[in-house]
Protein backbone atom coordinates (compact mmCIF):
# COMPACT_ATOMS: atom_id res chain seq x y z
CA UNK A 1 0.00 0.00 0.00
CA UNK A 2 1.04 3.54 -0.66
CA UNK A 3 1.20 5.60 2.55
CA UNK A 4 1.24 8.98 0.91
CA UNK A 5 0.48 9.94 -2.67
CA UNK A 6 0.65 13.47 -3.99
CA UNK A 7 -0.46 13.95 -7.56
CA UNK A 8 0.44 17.35 -8.95
CA UNK A 9 -1.63 18.56 -11.89
CA UNK A 10 -0.26 21.57 -13.68
CA UNK A 11 -2.68 24.19 -15.01
CA UNK A 12 -1.73 26.45 -17.90
CA UNK A 13 1.16 25.94 -20.27
CA UNK A 14 3.48 23.23 -18.97
CA UNK A 15 6.72 21.82 -20.25
CA UNK A 16 7.62 18.24 -19.59
CA UNK A 17 11.06 17.82 -18.07
CA UNK A 18 13.38 15.08 -19.24
CA UNK A 19 13.66 13.23 -15.97
CA UNK A 20 12.14 12.48 -12.60
CA UNK A 21 12.51 14.89 -9.77
CA UNK A 22 13.00 17.87 -12.10
CA UNK A 23 10.69 20.84 -11.81
CA UNK A 24 7.84 21.25 -14.29
CA UNK A 25 7.21 24.91 -15.11
CA UNK A 26 3.63 26.23 -15.16
CA UNK A 27 1.53 29.26 -14.37
CA UNK A 28 -0.28 27.56 -11.48
CA UNK A 29 -0.11 24.27 -9.64
CA UNK A 30 -2.75 22.39 -7.68
CA UNK A 31 -2.08 19.44 -5.38
CA UNK A 32 -4.68 16.70 -5.45
CA UNK A 33 -4.83 13.75 -3.06
CA UNK A 34 -5.99 10.97 -5.34
CA UNK A 35 -6.83 8.65 -2.47
CA UNK A 36 -9.55 11.06 -1.38
CA UNK A 37 -10.68 12.40 -4.78
CA UNK A 38 -13.31 10.68 -6.89
CA UNK A 39 -13.24 13.26 -9.68
CA UNK A 40 -13.67 11.31 -12.94
CA UNK A 41 -11.69 13.86 -14.98
CA UNK A 42 -8.73 13.54 -12.64
CA UNK A 43 -8.83 9.75 -12.80
CA UNK A 44 -8.86 9.80 -16.61
CA UNK A 45 -5.57 11.68 -16.82
CA UNK A 46 -2.03 11.16 -15.62
CA UNK A 47 -0.40 13.30 -12.94
CA UNK A 48 2.52 15.49 -13.90
CA UNK A 49 4.50 14.37 -10.86
CA UNK A 50 4.24 11.40 -8.55
CA UNK A 51 5.64 11.38 -5.02
CA UNK A 52 4.88 8.42 -2.79
CA UNK A 53 6.34 6.19 -0.11
CA UNK A 54 5.51 2.63 0.88
CA UNK A 55 4.35 1.91 4.42
CA UNK A 56 7.68 0.28 5.19
CA UNK A 57 9.61 3.28 3.86
CA UNK A 58 11.63 0.91 1.68
CA UNK A 59 10.28 2.25 -1.63
CA UNK A 60 9.92 5.91 -2.60
CA UNK A 61 8.71 7.58 -5.78
CA UNK A 62 10.11 10.93 -6.84
CA UNK A 63 9.12 11.31 -10.47
CA UNK A 64 8.08 13.74 -13.12
CA UNK A 65 6.11 11.59 -15.56
CA UNK A 66 7.56 11.77 -19.07
CA UNK A 67 4.60 11.93 -21.43
CA UNK A 68 3.80 13.42 -24.85
CA UNK A 69 3.04 17.13 -24.44
CA UNK A 70 -0.45 16.83 -25.91
CA UNK A 71 -1.47 13.75 -23.92
CA UNK A 72 -4.45 14.66 -21.71
CA UNK A 73 -6.16 11.29 -21.41
CA UNK A 74 -5.36 7.67 -20.59
CA UNK A 75 -6.73 6.56 -23.96
CA UNK A 76 -4.26 6.15 -26.82
CA UNK A 77 -4.43 5.08 -30.45
CA UNK A 78 -4.00 1.36 -31.13
CA UNK A 79 -1.32 0.69 -33.75
CA UNK A 80 0.38 -2.29 -35.35
CA UNK A 81 3.97 -2.67 -36.56
CA UNK A 82 4.21 -3.33 -40.29
CA UNK A 83 7.98 -3.83 -40.24
CA UNK A 84 11.33 -2.07 -40.34
CA UNK A 85 11.40 0.89 -42.71
CA UNK A 86 13.26 0.13 -45.95
CA UNK A 87 15.49 2.49 -47.92
CA UNK A 88 17.25 2.66 -51.30
CA UNK A 89 20.77 1.21 -50.95
CA UNK A 90 21.94 2.88 -54.17
CA UNK A 91 20.73 6.21 -52.86
CA UNK A 92 22.55 5.65 -49.57
CA UNK A 93 25.79 4.91 -51.41
CA UNK A 94 25.41 7.98 -53.61
CA UNK A 95 24.65 10.20 -50.63
CA UNK A 96 27.42 8.99 -48.32
CA UNK A 97 30.23 7.61 -50.50
CA UNK A 98 29.92 8.91 -54.05
CA UNK A 99 33.33 9.42 -55.67
CA UNK A 100 35.32 7.42 -53.12
CA UNK A 101 37.79 4.76 -54.25
CA UNK A 102 36.63 1.29 -53.20
CA UNK A 103 39.36 -0.91 -51.79
CA UNK A 104 37.06 -3.79 -50.87
CA UNK A 105 33.42 -4.70 -51.52
CA UNK A 106 31.49 -7.68 -50.19
CA UNK A 107 27.96 -8.75 -51.10
CA UNK A 108 25.92 -11.58 -49.65
CA UNK A 109 22.33 -12.53 -48.87
CA UNK A 110 20.89 -11.74 -45.46
CA UNK A 111 17.57 -12.30 -43.70
CA UNK A 112 16.31 -8.93 -44.95
CA UNK A 113 17.74 -8.97 -48.47
CA UNK A 114 21.16 -8.22 -49.90
CA UNK A 115 23.91 -7.01 -47.57
CA UNK A 116 26.65 -4.82 -49.04
CA UNK A 117 29.82 -3.84 -47.21
CA UNK A 118 32.30 -1.28 -48.57
CA UNK A 119 35.78 -0.32 -47.40
CA UNK A 120 37.34 2.70 -49.06
CA UNK A 121 41.00 3.51 -49.70
CA UNK A 122 40.95 6.50 -47.33
CA UNK A 123 39.78 4.31 -44.42
CA UNK A 124 36.07 5.15 -44.56
CA UNK A 125 33.49 2.34 -44.57
CA UNK A 126 29.82 1.80 -45.40
CA UNK A 127 27.59 -1.11 -44.35
CA UNK A 128 24.15 -1.49 -45.92
CA UNK A 129 21.67 -4.06 -44.61
CA UNK A 130 18.21 -3.24 -43.24
CA UNK A 131 20.26 -0.69 -41.31
CA UNK A 132 22.92 1.83 -42.39
CA UNK A 133 26.35 2.28 -40.81
CA UNK A 134 28.78 4.89 -42.12
CA UNK A 135 32.19 5.82 -40.70
CA UNK A 136 34.50 8.45 -42.16
CA UNK A 137 38.28 8.25 -42.46
CA UNK A 138 38.64 10.50 -39.39
CA UNK A 139 36.04 8.85 -37.14
CA UNK A 140 38.37 6.42 -35.36
CA UNK A 141 39.16 8.90 -32.56
CA UNK A 142 35.53 9.00 -31.41
CA UNK A 143 35.21 5.22 -31.62
CA UNK A 144 38.38 4.56 -29.63
CA UNK A 145 37.35 7.01 -26.91
CA UNK A 146 33.81 5.64 -26.80
CA UNK A 147 32.31 9.13 -26.72
CA UNK A 148 28.79 7.79 -27.35
CA UNK A 149 28.70 5.65 -24.21
CA UNK A 150 26.09 6.69 -21.65
CA UNK A 151 28.73 6.68 -18.89
CA UNK A 152 30.21 9.86 -20.35
CA UNK A 153 27.04 11.92 -20.83
CA UNK A 154 27.67 14.10 -17.77
CA UNK A 155 31.29 14.72 -18.79
CA UNK A 156 30.34 16.04 -22.23
CA UNK A 157 26.99 17.68 -21.42
CA UNK A 158 28.61 20.10 -18.98
CA UNK A 159 30.83 21.58 -21.72
CA UNK A 160 30.20 23.44 -24.98
CA UNK A 161 31.59 23.71 -28.51
CA UNK A 162 31.75 26.51 -31.07
CA UNK A 163 29.67 24.66 -33.65
CA UNK A 164 26.14 25.11 -35.00
CA UNK A 165 24.10 22.29 -33.48
CA UNK A 166 20.89 23.15 -35.35
CA UNK A 167 22.72 23.23 -38.68
CA UNK A 168 24.12 19.74 -38.16
CA UNK A 169 20.76 18.33 -37.06
CA UNK A 170 19.19 19.86 -40.18
CA UNK A 171 21.86 18.23 -42.35
CA UNK A 172 21.14 14.81 -40.86
CA UNK A 173 17.40 15.30 -41.29
CA UNK A 174 17.95 16.31 -44.91
CA UNK A 175 20.02 13.18 -45.59
CA UNK A 176 17.46 10.93 -43.90
CA UNK A 177 14.59 12.54 -45.81
CA UNK A 178 16.43 11.84 -49.07
CA UNK A 179 16.71 8.21 -48.01
CA UNK A 180 12.95 8.07 -47.43
CA UNK A 181 12.77 8.37 -43.64
CA UNK A 182 10.13 10.58 -42.01
CA UNK A 183 12.15 12.77 -39.66
CA UNK A 184 8.99 14.46 -38.35
CA UNK A 185 8.53 11.35 -36.21
CA UNK A 186 12.06 11.50 -34.81
CA UNK A 187 13.02 13.46 -31.69
CA UNK A 188 16.58 14.78 -32.08
CA UNK A 189 18.99 15.72 -29.28
CA UNK A 190 22.67 16.70 -29.35
CA UNK A 191 25.59 16.42 -26.94
CA UNK A 192 28.70 18.60 -27.46
CA UNK A 193 32.03 16.80 -27.77
CA UNK A 194 34.52 19.46 -26.70
CA UNK A 195 38.29 19.18 -27.03
CA UNK A 196 38.80 19.60 -23.29
CA UNK A 197 36.29 16.87 -22.42
CA UNK A 198 37.76 14.46 -24.98
CA UNK A 199 41.28 15.12 -23.66
CA UNK A 200 40.08 14.45 -20.13
CA UNK A 201 38.40 11.21 -21.21
CA UNK A 202 41.50 10.12 -23.14
CA UNK A 203 43.73 10.74 -20.11
CA UNK A 204 41.34 8.79 -17.87
CA UNK A 205 41.27 5.82 -20.22
CA UNK A 206 45.05 5.82 -20.61
CA UNK A 207 45.53 5.94 -16.83
CA UNK A 208 43.01 3.13 -16.33
CA UNK A 209 44.58 0.96 -19.01
CA UNK A 210 41.46 1.10 -21.18
CA UNK A 211 43.31 2.70 -24.08
CA UNK A 212 46.67 1.72 -25.53
CA UNK A 213 49.29 4.43 -25.75
CA UNK A 214 49.77 5.50 -29.35
CA UNK A 215 46.36 4.13 -30.34
CA UNK A 216 44.89 7.61 -30.75
CA UNK A 217 46.30 11.08 -31.17
CA UNK A 218 45.45 13.82 -28.71
CA UNK A 219 42.19 15.56 -29.73
CA UNK A 220 42.53 18.96 -31.42
CA UNK A 221 40.11 21.78 -32.21
CA UNK A 222 39.36 20.12 -35.56
CA UNK A 223 37.91 17.15 -33.67
CA UNK A 224 35.25 19.21 -31.88
CA UNK A 225 31.89 17.74 -32.76
CA UNK A 226 28.31 17.03 -31.78
CA UNK A 227 27.00 13.59 -30.92
CA UNK A 228 23.49 13.73 -32.36
CA UNK A 229 20.91 11.07 -31.63
CA UNK A 230 17.19 10.51 -32.14
CA UNK A 231 14.44 8.21 -30.93
CA UNK A 232 11.43 7.43 -33.10
CA UNK A 233 7.97 8.46 -31.95
CA UNK A 234 4.62 6.90 -32.86
CA UNK A 235 1.52 9.00 -32.17
CA UNK A 236 3.80 11.14 -30.03
CA UNK A 237 4.98 8.25 -27.83
CA UNK A 238 8.70 7.31 -28.03
CA UNK A 239 9.45 3.86 -29.41
CA UNK A 240 11.26 1.27 -27.27
CA UNK A 241 12.86 -0.60 -30.17
CA UNK A 242 13.42 -4.35 -30.29
CA UNK A 243 17.12 -4.31 -29.39
CA UNK A 244 16.24 -2.72 -26.05
CA UNK A 245 14.26 -5.85 -25.15
CA UNK A 246 17.02 -8.33 -25.93
CA UNK A 247 18.41 -8.22 -22.38
CA UNK A 248 18.15 -6.17 -19.20
CA UNK A 249 21.51 -4.51 -19.80
CA UNK A 250 20.23 -3.30 -23.20
CA UNK A 251 17.06 -1.66 -21.86
CA UNK A 252 18.43 1.72 -20.77
CA UNK A 253 16.84 4.87 -22.11
CA UNK A 254 20.12 6.49 -23.13
CA UNK A 255 21.69 8.18 -26.19
CA UNK A 256 23.80 5.13 -27.07
CA UNK A 257 20.61 3.06 -27.43
CA UNK A 258 18.96 5.47 -29.88
CA UNK A 259 18.15 4.06 -33.34
CA UNK A 260 19.70 7.12 -35.00
CA UNK A 261 23.20 8.13 -33.93
CA UNK A 262 25.61 10.48 -35.67
CA UNK A 263 28.79 12.43 -34.98
CA UNK A 264 29.14 15.68 -36.89
CA UNK A 265 32.28 17.84 -36.83
CA UNK A 266 33.41 20.88 -38.81
CA UNK A 267 34.91 18.36 -41.27
CA UNK A 268 31.47 16.94 -41.93
CA UNK A 269 29.64 13.72 -41.08
CA UNK A 270 32.05 11.53 -39.09
CA UNK A 271 29.70 8.61 -38.45
CA UNK A 272 26.06 7.68 -38.93
CA UNK A 273 23.96 4.72 -37.82
CA UNK A 274 20.29 4.33 -38.72
CA UNK A 275 18.65 1.26 -37.25
CA UNK A 276 15.28 -0.03 -36.00
CA UNK A 277 13.03 2.61 -37.57
CA UNK A 278 9.56 1.11 -38.02
CA UNK A 279 6.48 1.58 -40.15
CA UNK A 280 3.32 1.74 -38.04
CA UNK A 281 -0.34 1.45 -39.02
CA UNK A 282 -3.18 2.99 -37.03
CA UNK A 283 -6.01 0.63 -36.12
CA UNK A 284 -9.69 1.54 -35.69
CA UNK A 285 -9.73 0.94 -31.95
CA UNK A 286 -8.04 2.59 -28.98
CA UNK A 287 -6.31 1.37 -25.82
CA UNK A 288 -7.08 2.58 -22.31
CA UNK A 289 -4.10 2.65 -19.97
CA UNK A 290 -4.33 1.90 -16.27
CA UNK A 291 -4.25 4.78 -13.76
CA UNK A 292 -0.69 5.54 -12.77
CA UNK A 293 -1.20 4.75 -9.08
CA UNK A 294 -2.14 1.17 -10.06
CA UNK A 295 1.03 0.88 -12.13
CA UNK A 296 3.09 2.36 -9.29
CA UNK A 297 1.69 -0.22 -6.87
CA UNK A 298 3.16 -2.99 -9.08
CA UNK A 299 6.60 -1.40 -8.81
CA UNK A 300 6.19 -0.80 -5.09
CA UNK A 301 5.13 -4.38 -4.38
CA UNK A 302 8.11 -5.84 -6.26
CA UNK A 303 10.78 -3.85 -4.43
CA UNK A 304 9.01 -3.75 -1.07
CA UNK A 305 8.99 -7.56 -0.96
CA UNK A 306 12.72 -7.99 -1.59
CA UNK A 307 14.28 -9.27 1.62
CA UNK A 308 17.29 -7.01 2.02
CA UNK A 309 18.32 -3.76 3.67
CA UNK A 310 18.32 -1.77 0.44
CA UNK A 311 16.19 1.35 -0.03
CA UNK A 312 14.73 1.97 -3.48
CA UNK A 313 13.87 5.29 -5.08
CA UNK A 314 12.01 5.49 -8.39
CA UNK A 315 13.51 8.49 -10.18
CA UNK A 316 12.13 8.16 -13.71
CA UNK A 317 8.81 7.10 -15.19
CA UNK A 318 8.48 7.34 -18.96
CA UNK A 319 5.72 6.14 -21.26
CA UNK A 320 7.02 4.13 -24.22
CA UNK A 321 5.65 2.03 -27.05
CA UNK A 322 7.58 -1.23 -26.98
CA UNK A 323 8.25 -3.11 -30.22
CA UNK A 324 9.22 -6.75 -29.91
CA UNK A 325 9.01 -10.09 -31.70
CA UNK A 326 6.12 -12.24 -30.48
CA UNK A 327 5.94 -16.00 -30.11
CA UNK A 328 4.78 -16.22 -33.73
CA UNK A 329 8.03 -14.46 -34.77
CA UNK A 330 6.03 -11.46 -35.96
CA UNK A 331 6.34 -7.89 -34.75
CA UNK A 332 4.08 -6.85 -31.89
CA UNK A 333 3.80 -3.70 -29.80
CA UNK A 334 2.54 -2.71 -26.37
CA UNK A 335 2.44 0.49 -24.30
CA UNK A 336 4.81 0.30 -21.34
CA UNK A 337 6.03 2.34 -18.41
CA UNK A 338 9.81 2.54 -18.21
CA UNK A 339 11.06 2.99 -14.63
CA UNK A 340 14.55 3.79 -13.40
CA UNK A 341 15.07 2.69 -9.80
CA UNK A 342 18.06 3.70 -7.69
CA UNK A 343 19.35 1.26 -5.06
CA UNK A 344 20.62 3.12 -2.00
CA UNK A 345 21.09 6.18 -4.18
CA UNK A 346 23.73 4.63 -6.44
CA UNK A 347 23.10 1.50 -8.52
CA UNK A 348 20.41 1.92 -11.18
CA UNK A 349 18.02 -0.80 -12.30
CA UNK A 350 15.28 -0.69 -14.94
CA UNK A 351 11.77 -2.06 -14.55
CA UNK A 352 9.17 -2.30 -17.33
CA UNK A 353 5.42 -2.55 -16.74
CA UNK A 354 2.72 -3.00 -19.37
CA UNK A 355 0.74 0.26 -19.23
CA UNK A 356 -2.50 -1.45 -20.28
CA UNK A 357 -2.47 -4.63 -18.16
CA UNK A 358 -0.24 -3.60 -15.26
CA UNK A 359 1.92 -6.72 -15.61
CA UNK A 360 5.70 -6.56 -15.25
CA UNK A 361 7.73 -7.32 -18.37
CA UNK A 362 10.70 -9.52 -17.50
CA UNK A 363 13.63 -9.28 -19.89
CA UNK A 364 16.39 -11.92 -20.15
CA UNK A 365 19.39 -11.38 -17.89
Task: Indicate residue ranges for each PLM-predicted region.
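Positively charged n-region of N-terminal signal peptides that target proteins for export
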Residues: 1-5, 11
Amino acid sequence: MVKKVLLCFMLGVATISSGCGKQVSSEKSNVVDMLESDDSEVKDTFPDTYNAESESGKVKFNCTLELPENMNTRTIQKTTVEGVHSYDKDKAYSLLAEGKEISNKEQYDGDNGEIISYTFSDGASLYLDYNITWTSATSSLYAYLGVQQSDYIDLFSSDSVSLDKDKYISEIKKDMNELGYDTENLSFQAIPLSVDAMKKLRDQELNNGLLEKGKTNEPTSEDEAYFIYAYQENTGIPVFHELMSVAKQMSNDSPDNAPVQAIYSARGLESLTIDYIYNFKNEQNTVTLKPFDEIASVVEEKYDNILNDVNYEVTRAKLYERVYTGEDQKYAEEPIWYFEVMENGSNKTVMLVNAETGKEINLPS
